[in-house]
Amino acid sequence: MLHYLESAVPAGHYLEAVRGKSDQYNGFNLVLGTVNELFWYSNRGDGTLRLSSGIHGASNHLINTPWPKVERAKMEINRVLTSKAELEPEDLFKVLIDRWQPPDERLPDTGVGLEWERILGPMFITSPVYGTRSSTVILVDRRDRVTFVERTYSSVPEQFHDAQYHFHLTA
């Protein structure tokens, strides 16, 4: 990633290079580009996707897979965006710590069994053996000022540490 950030290589070209090495890694989703053009790539899918304007969601599968937590996150983010004149990182972190449990009949069947599907069902996962460890919010305002906040959690969403960075995008 550092190579991409320090270079002038277009996002689509960089992702083609990543694609050539992607079998060396566990499953991942990668979103990169500029504020005007974003791309998504996963080594679980068939290729690179240029993202259209709007709200997209990704979990541990392909982008916009209609899992209940992905659909709920997209709906809640849309609600926040349409109800707030000034958006703060905390507005989005409140969405990301949602522990709503989908009913069993709405859970995906990813091959891990019902007990694990229940554990993995909420946006914010808490279990003694597996859970959400961090969430990131990136806001870019109309003046190209960026607020980047990564929140690292202990075992519960109420206990966390934020790393926050502010910078200005340049051409």
Task: Place the predicted regions along the sequence by residue.
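N-terminal nucleophile
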Residues: 1-171
